[in-house]
Amino acid sequence: MPADSPGTPGRNYPFFATDIVLGNYAYVEEEFSFEGQANTYSIKPGTNAETLTSGTAYRSRMLVRRPATQTRFNGVVVVEWLNVTNGYDTDVLWLYQKEFLIREGYAWVGVSAQSVGVSRPPNGLRVWSPSRYGRLDVDGQGKVPGDALGYDIYAQAGAAVRKVPAVLGGLEARLVIAAGQSQSAGRLATYLNSIHHRDPVYDAALLTVNAATLRTDLTIPVIKVLSENEANSSRSQADSERIRTWTVAGATHSEQYSLLSRAAFLLRDLNLQAVDACDTPARSRVEIRYVYNAAVDSLVKWRRASIAPPNAPDLKFSGDILQRDDHRNALGGVRSIEMDVPVAHDAAINCGLGGTHVPFDDQTLSRLYPTHADYVGKVRNSAARLVKAGFMLKADADLAVANAERSIYGERLVCGPLCADVRQFPSHPSSILLAKQTAHLLIKDGSTLVALVDRATRAIAEGDTLGNDPRSKKKFAEAAAHLRSYVSKTQQFLAGGKVARESAALLIEQATTLITLVEARTK
């Protein structure tokens, strides 16, 4: 499907087209419509489905992000059942895993398989862009309820990855992994339990933040990665020959990375801001995405080389009560760095699926980490343990350690509201949030931008530490200067094609807001 540039008025471009300049990483994004005929099924839990009807015509679309050349391609395709919980198609797992997928040479395909994402007002594809998507039909022109055609639509999309050369631009798929997040993972679990055996398309599957029970006689390996939100149900199914369940302590169903990763294109395509409306500071900072990455890597090794992934410890319960430490963080489960080397209370409590993130006070941080080197060393050791255990990849561990080295933990600096990692823009502008937003957009040479914000963070913290000392004004002036340099450099990156227009606009707006607030502290 030919496309105009994302953000153009006619909306002749893919819905939620990526806000990454993929060409900088030798990747491309393409969208295809595809059509066929689908069955509906009688589905009973734990049994093979029976065909109810056959031959219903459909027309859907798939969004493909892939290496531009065979040399960049690792031969593995992740096919994501797009999530429609918010009333529109969302590429949730791509958002979490894009850095890993691009780094390691995966292809990714997102499939529209449900009528909410295709037809429901106000943001279904057909409503959002009638000229581009008006012919799509995944519910038999409204006559087939319950997304009953979706299973065959998803299966046939997976088959097309292998059988239709145009889908991958001539690249050869050697392994195809099914993937779904939350609601989509529930649909995928039903497909795996009852339908996939009829015409096996997928070689492995990743189900995230949905604890649906799977049949133990499945013929493909499956890993379920769960957060604290699904903790009770995660204990209902033990690991088996082809199934693993990894529950991540402190992680939440939808956390900060998920929110920041969609901020630019959400504003571009729907004029919506990715914000929270929670009384208690929300959005866990536990990096569940690193466990997702390890799960995909493990599935590939499991399928290709029969190397079984590790069994993960369960979260610790007393009856139905999740046990917590003195910081109110969960005990047991996959121990993320954020749980092993905590700087905050992170949990699934509070605000629906967003959970909680409440930073420790300065006294607690100073007691836990007397020096910056102490903090970084503990992060490094935790990352090494996770890599050895199989729940984190070495490249992600290196990134986590680098982030620790960039931080100011252990330096006995006061990080006030203008630099604190709490809540979100625009309700809580802060330099650390700006640095995270910048990093999450995968800007080519984006470390240059992040470094400028880090300098601003340090200057703000030094100013906060000085308190009413007149020298604090100089520190805030330094911070404002670093942020102005950031804006200038972002504009240069936009002109040079390193950052997408919508991403640059978001970052410049956030930085400008922060500059105004920081400059007020120089008066």
Task: Name each model-derived stretch.
Residues 351-523:
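Soluble extracellular-acting proteins and domains
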Residues 1-423, 495:
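C-terminal His-loop and adjacent cap/lid subdomain of alpha/beta-hydrolase
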